């Protein structure tokens, strides 16, 4: 059976990973394509 500490560590690691994935997605999406938008 999984303990409370193991569940807390797993959920924290999963949350940090998903947060960094969203940040990386937005960073990549904002900095690719649309080269004319930066000229304004």
UniProtKB/Swiss-Prot annotation:
GO biological process: protein N-linked glycosylation; protein N-linked glycosylation via asparagine
Pfam families the record matches: Ost4
Lumenal membrane side: 1-4
GO terms for cellular component: oligosaccharyltransferase complex
InterPro entries tied to this protein: Oligosaccaryltransferase (IPR018943), OST4 (IPR051307), Ost4p_sf (IPR036330)
Compartments reported by the entry: Endoplasmic reticulum membrane
Membrane topology: Single-pass type III membrane protein
Transmembrane annotation, as ranges: 5-25
Cytoplasmic side: 26-40
Domain of life: Eukaryota
Keywords: Endoplasmic reticulum, Membrane, Signal-anchor, Transmembrane, Transmembrane helix
Functional description taken from the UniProt entry: Subunit of the oligosaccharyl transferase (OST) complex that catalyzes the initial transfer of a defined glycan (Glc(3)Man(9)GlcNAc(2) in eukaryotes) from the lipid carrier dolichol-pyrophosphate to an asparagine residue within an Asn-X-Ser/Thr consensus motif in nascent polypeptide chains, the first step in protein N-glycosylation. N-glycosylation occurs cotranslationally and the complex associates with the Sec61 complex at the channel-forming translocon complex that mediates protein translocation across the endoplasmic reticulum (ER). All subunits are required for a maximal enzyme activity.
PANTHER family membership: DOLICHYL-DIPHOSPHOOLIGOSACCHARIDE--PROTEIN GLYCOSYLTRANSFERASE SUBUNIT 4
Family: Belongs to the OST4 family.
Subunit architecture: Component of the oligosaccharyltransferase (OST) complex.
Name this polypeptide is given: Dolichyl-diphosphooligosaccharide--protein glycosyltransferase subunit 4
Organism: Drosophila yakuba
Lineage: Eukaryota, Metazoa, Ecdysozoa, Arthropoda, Hexapoda
């Amino acid at each position: 059976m999984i303990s409370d500490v193991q569940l807390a560590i797993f959920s924290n690691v999963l949350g940090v990973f998903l947060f960094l994935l969203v940040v990386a997605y937005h960073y990549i999406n904002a900095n690719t394509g649309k080269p004319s938008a930066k000229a304004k």
